[in-house]
Every structure is written in C-alpha cells, then in structure tokens.
From Swiss-Prot:
Keyword DNA repair attached: no
Binding partners and assembly: Homodimer. Part of the ribosomal stalk of the 50S ribosomal subunit. Forms a multimeric L10(L12)X complex, where L10 forms an elongated spine to which 2 to 4 L12 dimers bind in a sequential fashion. Binds GTP-bound translation factors.
UniProt-listed PANTHER family: 39S RIBOSOMAL PROTEIN L12, LARGE RIBOSOMAL SUBUNIT PROTEIN BL12M
Name recorded for this polypeptide: Large ribosomal subunit protein bL12
Organism from which the protein derives: Methylorubrum extorquens (strain PA1) (Methylobacterium extorquens)
Amino acid sequence: MADLAKIVEDLSSLTVLEAAELAKLLEEKWGVSAAAAVAVAAGPAAGAGAAAVEEQTEFTVVLASAGDKKIEVIKEVRAITGLGLKEAKDLVEGAPKPVKEGATKDEAEKLKAQLEKAGAKVELK
C-alpha cells in the first residue's frame, strides 16, 4: 500500500507535458489508446445530458386543489375523465391527484385551462 501511495505522489508532481509523455509511453507499452477510453467513458454522460435537454412529450395533469368552486370542478373532471359522479367527487376531494396521464403538451395545456376556468388549481408534470 505504501508503494501505491508513493506512485500517486510521484504522478501528482508531474507537469502536464510530463503526464502527456507518460500517457504516450503507456499507450505504446500496453497497446491501448487513452482517447478511446475517454470516448467510452464520456459516451453515457453525453447521452444523459442530451436526454435532459429533450423536450418533455408526455405530461400528467394533476389537480392540486379544487378551490372555491368544487361543484364546477367535479363537473369538469367528469367531462374530462368520463368518471361517474362519486368517482369524480372522490378524485376532487382527494387532491392532489392526477386527472390525466400521458397527455400531449397541447392536450395537457387545454385540460389545465378547462380546470382552471372551473376554479381548480392545476399542475403539469
């Protein structure tokens, strides 16, 4: 273990030019390429970054609260979901609850506007 600590200490004291020369020597000795290893290591990270930048395509419309006009919100939830009166009432009273999952952006915005017009507070996730 002391030998490894000494190697780490020696490597830490190298200049950038010396480290580059060491990398070349090791590539030749072991028959590998450091550039390929860096590309493989960076590949998944670059893919994750691209996924985070992509625009969300599916949304969940969540009823945060019914607000003051609970009856109007229940009517709107029934119209949107096709639920019966009792099920729609339970959904509204149990807020926050999802009203619609897997909606497109346009559909989610439309549903949000309908519910907010009825007096509900709505979130898109």
